[in-house]
Regions:
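N-terminal binding-site loop/beta-alpha segment at the start of enzyme catalytic domains
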Residues: 1-68, 187, 261, 266-269
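Acidic (Asp/Glu)-rich catalytic clusters
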Residues: 5-6, 55-67, 89-98, 122-124, ...
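Short acidic capping loops at alpha-helix termini that bridge into adjacent secondary structure
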Residues: 13, 64-68, 98-102, 130-131, ...
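Acidic-and-aromatic substrate-binding clefts and catalytic sites of carbohydrate-active enzymes
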Residues: 21-25, 43-53, 77-82, 108-112, ...
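Short, acidic/polar
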Residues: 22-35, 80-95, 142-143, 164-165
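Generic structural signal for well-ordered alpha-helices
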Residues: 31, 51, 55-58, 85-92, ...
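Glycine/small-residue-rich loop that forms an oxyanion/phosphate-binding "nest" at active or ligand-binding sites
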Residues: 73, 77-121
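Beta/alpha (TIM)-barrel catalytic core signal, keyed to glycine-rich beta->alpha loops juxtaposed to Asp/Glu
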Residues: 108-269
Length: 269
């Protein structure tokens, strides 16, 4: 199950997020376990401090590099044209890789995001990264970027769940062919026990987590759940293997409440 990005890049639609996964052997082991279970998409970032561990887990798996999609991100302190290029070099060195599959601007930093984007365009043109995108960009950020960019982002990674559906941003992304990745698709656990989620899950013979992930997949999203438990990793990946009924989707669609569980980029200028 992949999403076709520009340039023939295939993005696996269920990925493993490693935000706040402890550095060192913990992340390394989780990544290897996930890859052994069938994950082929790992999402890290410079600010997470575990880029090297992700790459080590990939190597431990024995899988060919070409079979695993690796995303990392440019942190705020490294934005700006020259700084972004240096930070990318550092990420590549930390990971010991020759190429990154997807490189994202982590946040729409005022006064620097356009110059940072030009750096990402250069990296993609040079073949050092296969696809480029953004994270936490709302409609006004995207409209500004699209009016200045030589090429639009391939991806926008934002928080999305049935409780925070981001319909306006998603519609804009669809208009410009920008894939939407959903981080915190499980609401950091805050709504797994919601009565309607539990009801839909029971009717489908699935878990609440699988139902939330499947909702995202059926809306065309790439979902990035995180877990350190092998059983949960397998459970999340199995969201690919069933389909929710139109009635179940409508019930989940009705749960919008503007729930933000992390950063809120809607307030970013």
């Amino acid at each position: 199950m992949t999403y076709p990005l520009r340039g023939g890049v295939a993005l696996p639609r269920v990925g493993l997020g490693v935000f706040r996964t402890p550095r060192g052997q913990t992340t390394r082991g989780i990544v290897k376990t996930a890859l052994d279970l069938g994950y082929r998409h790992i999402d890290t970032a410079r600010i997470y401090g575990n880029e090297r561990d992700v790459a080590d887990g990939l190597r431990d798996s024995g899988l060919p590099r070409s079979e695993v999609f690796v995303t990392t991100k440019l942190w705020n302190d490294d934005q700006g044209y020259d700084a972004a290029l240096r930070a990318f070099d550092a990420s590549l060195e930390h990971m010991g890789l020759e190429q990154i599959d997807l490189f994202l601007l982590h946040w729409p930093v005022p006064g620097k995001r356009l110059a940072s984007w030009r750096a990402l365009e250069r990296l993609r043109a040079e073949g050092r990264v296969r696809a480029i995108g953004v994270s936490n960009f709302m409609e006004h950020h995207l409209e500004e970027l699209l009016s200045h960019a030589n090429e639009p982002p391939s991806v926008n990674q934002i928080e999305v769940s049935p409780f925070l559906q981001q319909r306006g941003v998603r519609a804009l992304c669809e208009r410009y062919g920008i894939a939407v990745e959903a981080y915190s698709p499980l609401t950091k656990g805050a709504r797994l026990a919601h009565p309607e989620v539990v009801r839909v899950a029971a009717a489908a013979g699935r878990t609440p987590a699988q139902v939330l992930l499947r909702w995202g997949l059926q809306h065309g999203l790439i979902v990035l759940p995180k877990s350190s438990a092998p059983a949960r990793l397998a459970e999340n990946l199995a969201a690919r293997d069933f389909e929710l009924s139109p009635e179940a989707m409508a019930a989940l669609d009705a749960l919008e409440e503007g729930l933000v569980t992390g950063w809120d980029p809607r307030r970013a200028p």
